[in-house]
């Protein structure tokens, strides 16, 4: 009788080899999960950090995924595409992300406010840098690309931007810029009574400002509207006053004649009176300095009061 005895040691070794433990490799680098990009370091997702992957910069926010569109990071706004790549580059340019358009510099930071770009188009970007599209703002219409309609309102805006740029600088305070705009209107406008605006027409204050700034001439309404347009351009909210002051030009029985000046924050500014020398020193004064009547006050920005 033959008896078979198992080699116990060899069997144990064979069993161990067949059930060897598989070691899972920890994630490192960029991974796309459920439509969002994440970055792993030693198997853990990172957050609130910049990372560069294959030459493209990403920012992984507080929820771990790469942020997209516009985001404020350490006090600055940056624009990213829909994959989370920072839209930086060699020069400033218009970029499109989804339905939004931005004008970003080489660091991916968008411009805000009014923009007159090298394509000869006027745009307006909100506080996040998004272009206004298919809407009207301050009587200027924007199309689906964010471009302003080419009309008198656009022409006035570009004219004001140019005058302010040529007569002020970034080191000036807001009040210093206002004085520079005042000096420009007073010194560069000659009096002409050939044109009186129709105060019943819509946007007469803007068309009058454009006429005066464009021709360098105007009556009291022209001076007032031109100064109000420039004041608005540097951030004030002026009113054009349509009133009457003592005078004989209109031949009215009560001894008053038509006149126009500007109110800013309740203070009076009379550029035509200054330029012509008949009522000087009315610059930011709490009182007008002579008796007057007010027919209406028109907010230059909104048109309220017209």
Predicted regions and their residues:
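Extracellular adhesion/carbohydrate-binding repeat motifs centered on closely spaced tryptophans
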Residues: 1-155, 249-265, 273, 292
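Short, basic/low-complexity N-terminal boundary segments at the transition from targeting/disordered tails
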Residues: 15, 105, 236-238, 304
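Non-catalytic ligand/cofactor/substrate-binding and regulatory segments of enzyme domains
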Residues: 150-160, 181, 288-295
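Short coil/turn segments at secondary-structure boundaries
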Residues: 151, 169, 215-218
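Secondary-structure boundary elements
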Residues: 155-212
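Active-site nucleophilic cysteine motif
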Residues: 177-181, 185, 216-231
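Hydrophobic/aromatic-rich core segments of domains that either
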Residues: 222-291
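Low-complexity, Gly/Ser/Thr/Pro-rich intrinsically disordered linker/tail segments
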Residues: 282-306
């Amino acid at each position: 009788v033959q008896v078979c005895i198992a080699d116990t040691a060899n069997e144990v070794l064979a069993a161990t080899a067949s059930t060897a433990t598989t070691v899972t490799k920890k994630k490192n680098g960029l991974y796309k999960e459920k439509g969002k990009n994440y970055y792993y370091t030693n198997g853990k997702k990172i957050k609130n950090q910049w990372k560069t992957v294959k030459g493209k910069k990403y920012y992984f926010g507080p929820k771990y995924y790469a942020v997209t569109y516009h985001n404020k990071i350490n006090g600055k706004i940056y624009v990213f595409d829909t994959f989370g790549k920072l839209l930086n580059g060699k020069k400033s340019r218009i970029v499109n992300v989804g339905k939004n358009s931005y004008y970003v510099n080489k660091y991916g930071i968008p411009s805000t406010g009014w923009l007159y770009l090298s394509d000869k188009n006027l745009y307006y970007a909100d506080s996040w840098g998004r272009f206004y599209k298919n809407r009207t703002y301050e009587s200027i219409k924007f199309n689906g690309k964010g471009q302003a309609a080419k009309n008198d309102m656009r022409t006035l805006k570009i004219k004001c931007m140019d005058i302010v740029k040529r007569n002020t600088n970034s080191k000036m305070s807001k009040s210093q810029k206002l004085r520079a705009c005042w000096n420009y209107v007073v010194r560069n406008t000659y009096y002409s009574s050939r044109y009186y605006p129709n105060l019943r027409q819509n946007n007469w204050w803007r068309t009058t400002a454009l006429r005066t700034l464009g021709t360098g001439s105007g009556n009291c309404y022209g001076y007032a509207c031109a100064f109000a347009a420039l004041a608005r351009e540097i951030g004030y909210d002026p009113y054009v006053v349509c009133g009457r002051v003592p005078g004989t030009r209109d031949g009215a029985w009560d001894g008053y004649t038509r006149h126009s000046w500007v109110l800013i924050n309740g203070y009076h500014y009379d550029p035509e009176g200054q330029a012509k020398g008949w009522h000087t020193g009315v610059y930011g004064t709490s009182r007008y300095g002579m008796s007057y009547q007010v027919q209406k006050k028109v907010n230059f920005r909104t048109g309220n009061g017209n």
